């Protein structure tokens, strides 16, 4: 399960280093405005899907993918995000 997320992180980093012409992933990585807009769009679509009880899994997957690309486009390392979550986990268990 987590291997899939790790593969997406690796894909984002590889495409950022070695772009592929015409790649949607590269479009997201090189156009921060597009990447941001897609995250907002996909989150709204997920909310609508949950409320309508349809396509929830598909839309959730879209959110994960676009968020990962947005983070990478903006040089936000997933390792730093995970470290922050680890810190918060300690607060919750207190």
Predicted regions and their residues:
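Flexible "arm" and connector segments at domain edges
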Residues: 1-60, 64-94
